[in-house]
Amino acid sequence: MKRIIEICANSAQSCVEAEAGGATRVELCAGIPEGGTTPSYGEIKTAKALTSKIDINVIIRPRGGDFLYTEAEVQSMLLDIELCKELKVHGVVFGCLTKDGDIDVPLMRRLIEAAKPLSVTCHRAFDVCRDPFTALEQLIELGCDRILTSGQQSDAVKGIPLIAELVKRADGRIIIMPGCGVRENNIGKIEAETGAKEFHTSARSIVYSKMEYRNENVPMGSSIVSSEFETVQTDREKVKAYI
């Protein structure tokens, strides 16, 4: 079976680069430093307009931080799902937990029902749930299509033992997709030792600003942004290395 590559894309242009590099799918996100948040309507619509072959999945995450949501946040998520359906994207990506660290089954069912007929991926909320094997069975019962996971570790290489067990227990009932720290120099190892067939990675490079006048004394964001005059973007040549 051909290796399926999903690119974590932070912009419409990153979606273009991912498609040019031969990726199968993108997860379109804003707020990458926060782990990914819902992109704007304009970004999603532009990504759709500029691509023709690649599947676009959109993260539905109203904020960074934990995965315990208020009703106001849930309403926002439902509206964003409706917009994604209107724009005819391929799928949506979300994950919700209870205060005790379990999958919030009623809320996930509510969101999955709202998302139909779109594909649904449970994101790395799974990696901070209390019991991954119970969560696995719950997500299968809910009709989730795939789980994005680092094996409840800081990166997918460290999570190989759990990822392999999840693939075994899933037995084709749901797709287990390793992500976080998947690189061209370790994807073969992860593939061989887990049996996974889909992989999530960023394949980004730094893009330097073309600004000539620069006032570097006035930052526009927090200290986690290294410079106002550089951004990151999917690199089609890096994508090709994973295919």
Swiss-Prot record:
Swiss-Prot/TrEMBL keywords: Cytoplasm
InterPro entries referenced in this protein's UniProt entry, alphabetically: CutC-like, CutC-like_dom_sf
Pfam family membership, one: CutC
An example Gene Ontology CC term for this record: cytoplasm
Subcellular location: Cytoplasm
Origin superkingdom: Bacteria
Protein family (similarity comment): Belongs to the CutC family.
Protein name from the UniProt record: PF03932 family protein CutC
Species name: Parabacteroides distasonis (strain ATCC 8503 / DSM 20701 / CIP 104284 / JCM 5825 / NCTC 11152)
Originating gene: cutC
